[in-house]
Amino acid sequence: MGHRLHVAKKYDVQYAAGDAFNYKVEEIHYLLDACCENNYPYTGDEHDDEFEVSKEDWLEMIEVIKYAYGLDSTITKNNYWVDIDCVRQSCINLVKDKDEPLTEGEVTNLLSDLQYFLDNSEPKESYLHLCFF
């Protein structure tokens, strides 16, 4: 099982800055699954360490997290029919090792880290190629 999440640019995987989501293979899949209509299940197989996510779904995940934490007043419940408690718990599991609510700063950092992977993906592709190693 992989350890650190990295993003591929032209299938030339670049080391990610920082240590966001290290050792969190299962947790990133659960967050994607909680936030996106498309399915990104965690199966426990070795191929879970390397996967692709559409940029549209990655953006949707960011927007759903903003909605779940009330950070964007332009997003309403009509935009997303998600289980807010499940989204928040998935965020907690991704960010912390303890089961306690995220602070506003932790949510901001999470969103910034997710945006980093989007910004550093291959601009010509419609998906992010992510891998843990």
Give the ranges of each region predicted by the language model.
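Acidic (Asp/Glu-rich) sequence patches and key acidic residues
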Residues: M1-K124, F133
